[in-house]
Amino acid sequence: MELYFLGTGAGMPARHRNVTSIVLNLLPERGSIWFFDCGEGTQHQILRSPVKLSKSEKLFVTHLHGDHIFGLPGLLSSRSYQGGDTPFTIYGPKGIKAYVDMSLQLSQVHLDYELAIREIPSEGGVVFEDESFRVEAAPLDHRIECFGYRIVEKDLPGKLQQEKLHELGITAGPLYGRLKQGQTVKLEDGRELRGSDFVGPSIKGRTVTILGDTKPCGNSALLAEGADVLVHEATFGAEREDLAAAYDHSTTEQAARTAAEGGVGALIMTHISSRYQGEGAERLLEEARAIHPDSWLAEDFYSHAVPRRQS
């Protein structure tokens, strides 16, 4: 599991930062990648990255401001041109379906794959769940409806303790799979083996929280609680807290406090104003690390592995 940042700027493209798009690489876990937002120019960023559009499965939209969605129609079209034929699902606030449908209709784009669009209720909730992952959404505090997402990897089964089975004279075979699933197995000699006796502790799943644009609010704290990695906007430095409040954004220090108070592992700041370059960007990182030492300032094409934290 790895985060890859295709765009980390705020508002409009800049020379050193494109607008927002984040990829959650789940190729080892489920053979696919998930997008979070798709600002204009995202396809150009993909061409300069290891990201494979053909492996995309889902796209989660935080809100409908242009710097988060203007690249979406083109990305959907290119996915089809590149031979993508597996289903693709978009999740986002009310209005995302009308935006996508109208864009594709007016440009007469035909998709060679099944496209589903799920609009999220204003109160949020669980928007996706299967046997391996759960994704929760909650509304944030921005000028228009905006969501944050909490991606939870479910716990994995513990490792089969093969050495204990070897001691009983049981070699690899179909029984191993049944025991690993926790089943009780009866041997030909009458012995019964309980799977729970031969499987180690479950492996704790990881949690990633990705917030859309927001000023500090209760739901951003709830979504961040205990996350292994928190992706939080930090449009402004601490010296412009007044400007952040006026435009419903956050500062570096506010993002860091959310991470520190929530017991977060790593904080990754993104959605950075173009005014911060060079030494200015370094200062942003210093401000955050003074509060939450495990803080990082994303740049375009920055990647961050999501570790399994020790319980």
Question: Where are the model-predicted features located?
Answer:
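Divalent metal-coordination and catalytic microenvironments
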Residues: 3, 22, 46, 63, ...
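A short helix->loop->beta-strand "cap" motif at the edges of active sites that frequently abuts
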Residues: 84-88, 262-267, 293
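Active-site neighborhood of phospho(di)ester-bond hydrolases with catalytic His/Asp-centered motifs
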Residues: 36-39, 56-64, 93, 209-212, ...
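Conserved beta-strand hairpin/beta-sheet module of binuclear metal-dependent hydrolase folds
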Residues: 1-49, 85-87, 149-151, 158, ...
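Metal-dependent phosphodiesterase/nuclease catalytic metal-binding core
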Residues: 23, 121-269, 280-286, 306-311
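Active-site metal-binding motif and surrounding structural segment of the metallo-beta-lactamase
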Residues: 40-91, 119-121
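A glycine-rich helix N-cap at a beta->alpha junction
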Residues: 109-120, 294
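Metal-dependent catalytic neighborhoods of phosphoester/phosphodiester hydrolases
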Residues: 72-78, 277-287
